Amino acid sequence: MRWPPWASDSQAQQQTAKHDEHDERQAAAKSTTTSKKKDWESSVTAIDWAAFTEARTIIPTLILTSGFLGAFYIHRRYLRRFPDAVSITPSYFRRRSLLGQVTSVGDGDNFRIYHTPGGRLAGWGWLPWKKIPTSKKELRDKTVHIRLAGIDAPELAHFGRPEQPFAREAHQWLTSYLLGRRVRAYIHRPDQYQRAVASVYVRRLLDFPPLRRRDVSYEMLKRGLATVYEAKIGAEFGGEAMERKYKKAEWWAKLRGVGLWKDYRRNKTKWESPREYKTRMGLEEAAQPPVETKK
């Protein structure tokens, strides 16, 4: 039907053709827009898998990954700090050592160290964030309790027990020999008192020859400041060769009558080793009647 009614057939055909042409242009424009949108989305989400197999991608990735894993391994194996003896992993027992600074000496055969893994090469003592604490408050729960392997020193007065002869001299010597110095402790095992039983070595400038590595347990035995560990259970020497060496050092100190062996020959019947002293104290305490508590 012509519209308007008075229009001729040719005019109606021209108008229809214009409308059709307009619709075609809109459809073409819409199709182009949709195609461009799809192309953009596909370009964004497309993954060029071939790029991941190129040398320029693989080599830096391998270097970065290896560096990260290597740094993690070195830190875990060599630079991890143990805050106490309980934290020491079994992989250290009879295999590895701890480097640290002695912060206190509790008795003639035990002391505490602040573990400094890596030593000065790792920045301990000179980097601002690797300073060794000095106050008791700062050191609380941050030191490893070390028990010297292979020896038994005279007992100081504690837990209500009297002081054993020559205990104070042994404690004073060990304090002057180790306090504030860096030592290396070869860990054998933990003991029942949450200490690490270890063979400990120190270097001192004033010793002769200077800076020679000294076995602390051996030095105490030579001076008659301790006896060879006599208990049958829990004895640690670091091997049979070290046990023979310690017994020989004790024999020489006894022969010369130095330290706690001074009155041994004249008073053998009353002379008491640290092991005998602890056994006697244990028997006396066991024989005492239990203390009744007031209700």
UniProtKB/Swiss-Prot annotation:
GO molecular function, one term: metal ion binding
Residue ranges of the TM segments: 52-74
SUPFAM superfamilies to which the protein is assigned, alphabetical: Staphylococcal nuclease
Biased composition range(s): Basic and acidic residues: 17-27
Domain TNase-like: 96-263
Main subcellular location: mitochondrion
SMART domains, sorted: SNc (SM00318)
Primary enzyme class: hydrolase
Signal sequence range: none
Active-site residues annotated for this sequence: 147, 155, 195
Subcellular localization: Mitochondrion; Membrane
Keyword vocabulary terms for this entry: Calcium, Endonuclease, Hydrolase, Membrane, Metal-binding, Mitochondrion, Nuclease, Transmembrane, Transmembrane helix
EC numbers for this chain: 3.1.-.-
Bilayer disposition of the protein: Single-pass membrane protein
A GO term from the CC aspect: mitochondrion
Region (Disordered): 1-35
Top-rank taxon, per record: Eukaryota
Residues reported in the UniProt entry to bind Ca(2+): 152
Family note: Belongs to the LCL3 family.
Matches recorded under PANTHER family: EBNA2 BINDING PROTEIN P100, SERINE_THREONINE-PROTEIN KINASE 31
Entry protein name: Probable endonuclease lcl3
